[in-house]
Regions:
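Short, conserved catalytic or interaction motifs in soluble domains
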Residues: 9
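Beta-propeller-forming repeat regions
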Residues: 14-16, 23-505
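C-terminal motif of bacterial Sec signal peptides marking the signal peptidase cleavage site
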Residues: 5-6
Length: 505
């Protein structure tokens, strides 16, 4: 839903690339009538978002996409635009569309040998009837994995035995809280008592839809365990994430929420703390941005001025990364730091990290949500928005991964710099021959700030996200991925990081 300066063998293919395909396929005709028609279509189809690129879908798909677009306009109840003829609009997009959108086969992509192997260790697991794992977090202090299940709404903790001994690990996980289709849980110390608490975004439904069933809840930790969830705000749409943040510098902790919604609902929200106790705050819900589609929020000082900023990613038709620079006292300046080339690029997630370790925080993002069109797309994958300082940004495309939903960064190969790992989810991968799609890849950073792509696993494109951690205590960063599509399996899978020489002994 977000070219970049290329870092792999095909630098021109990337979400921020500008290609000849952006030219009107109809305007190449010589008639004045065709030029007028093209201009009319482009005004109409590019009014609410970027003008769609005809090459992003095959010819056969454009009738459905065009009719959907017209229906969106009708549902919006707008009457200020002149509608072009629907059949002519379909012909316009089909004229520039390929018969097929081709994606390179994973097993035919050239890549150098990987210095690492990630080996699945099935001793680490917490079996679930229907995982639908929305988030996994590793807690080094307790040697635990916290994970949320969006289908049943549970937030659970799975603990490893002492000294990383998997023989002491419990096969069962401990229930922390149950919400209404819990998505992400942000660990924090809300009341500053030294115990971990969780701010939880609740979707309110498992299927997509426009409704007011979503919530934001707070789970407080104590010496005896976790208290029942307290609802901070209800009657929201589909809340994917809530973050603690003193938005207005008044000393009270507020909440920023990514309320994704669907088509007619959703917003970037602020729960402003109006007082009360830390355990029972009085919150006022304020809409900061009425647009639907925020996929997440992160908070950091990205311009180095000592004030906290916050970054919001938008999916749906917007496909942007938008940074709100903090100016103090609840004032912010918004800037779009990355804008994907087309409404179909499917921004899925992002993280703030100093990827090049130059002292300035960067952004690594994935685009690859395939749950709308169920199409493999060659422009899905991982990108880097590099912070050059003084609020200037450089965009780089790291590489392809169909269905890329999330990434994590760590020094995977132990050479002192940060590498990137990402997972993909594509439900139709199971219908293709083996070797068609990668499901997990990592990008090895080289001294010249380039990245070399390596495949970790193929075909099992069922993962919603990932994180890195030294799970077995050997000093190497391992990989934890969370399961979404397959029933009656572990909610997560742990891949241990091994040098090639060791793993082949």
């Amino acid at each position: 839903m977000l070219g970049l300066i290329g870092c792999d063998s095909s630098p021109s293919v990337g979400p921020l690339a500008t290609t000849k395909s952006r030219m009107s396929p109809v305007r190449e005709n010589q008639t004045e009538q065709s030029k007028v028609l093209a201009a009319k279509i482009e005004r109409f189809c590019g009014d609410c978002h970027k003008m769609p690129d005809p090459t992003t879908f095959p010819k056969s798909r454009w009738p459905e996409e065009v009719i959907q677009g017209f229906n969106f306009y009708v549902d919006s109840q707008r009457t200020d635009m002149e509608e072009p003829d629907r059949l002519e609009t379909i012909k316009y997009f089909q004229a520039g569309a390929p018969d097929h959108v081709d994606v390179p086969r994973a097993d035919q992509m050239e890549q150098p040998p990987s210095p690492l192997r990630f080996v699945l260790d099935e001793r680490y697991q917490a079996k679930m009837e229907s995982p639908s794992t929305a988030q996994v977090q590793w807690d080094q202090a307790t040697k635990s994995i916290f994970f949320s299940n969006m289908r049943d709404g549970e937030l659970r903790q799975w603990s490893l035995g002492s000294e990383q001994n998997t023989s002491e690990a419990s096969p069962e996980s401990k229930l922390i809280a149950t919400g209404s289709h819990t998505c992400r849980a942000t660990k924090c110390d809300w009341n500053q008592d030294g115990f971990d608490d969780f701010l939880i975004g609740e979707m309110g439904s498992f299927p997509v839809g426009d409704h007011e069933k979503g919530r934001i809840s707070l789970v407080l930790g104590t010496a005896q365990g976790y208290l029942p969830p307290k609802i901070l705000q209800d009657k929201l749409s589909r809340v994917v994430e809530a973050r603690p943040f003193d938005y207005d510098d008044d000393g009270r902790m507020d909440v920023l929420a990514a309320d994704f919604g669907w088509r007619t609902t959703g917003a970037l929200r602020l729960l402003k703390n109006m007082g009360g106790s830390a355990e029972s705050p009085q919150m006022e819900s304020i809409i900061l941005d009425p647009r639907h589609g925020p996929v997440g929020i992160d908070i950091a000082d990205l311009d180095g001025d000592g004030k906290q900023d916050f970054l919001v990613g938008y999916g749906q038709e917007f496909e942007t990364l938008e940074l709100h620079y903090g100016q103090g006292q609840g004032k912010y300046q918004r800037e779009i730091v990355a804008s994907l080339a087309d409404p179909s690029y499917n921004l899925s997630a992002f993280q703030i990290v100093d990827l090049d370790q130059d002292g300035k925080l960067d952004i690594v993002y994935t685009c690859g949500d395939t749950m709308d069109a169920l199409l493999a797309k060659p422009y899905h994958g991982v990108g880097w928005v590099r912070n050059l300082g003084e609020r200037k940004w450089e965009h780089r495309w790291l590489g392809l991964l169909v269905g890329a939903l999330a990434s994590s960064t760590a020094d995977l190969d132990g050479d002192g710099d940060l590498d990137v790992v990402a997972v993909g989810m594509f439900p139709k991968a199971k219908d293709e021959p083996e070797g068609t799609f990668d499901s997990i890849c990592w990008w090895e950073q080289t001294p010249d700030l380039n990245f070399v792509r390596h495949s970790i696993e193929r075909d099992r494109c069922t993962y919603a996200s990932c994180t890195t951690a030294d799970v077995n205590g050997d000093g190497r960063q391992d990989l934890i991925v969370w399961e979404w599509l397959i029933p009656n399996v572990s909610a997560f899978r742990v891949y241990l990081n091994q040098p090639v020489a060791e793993s082949t002994r």
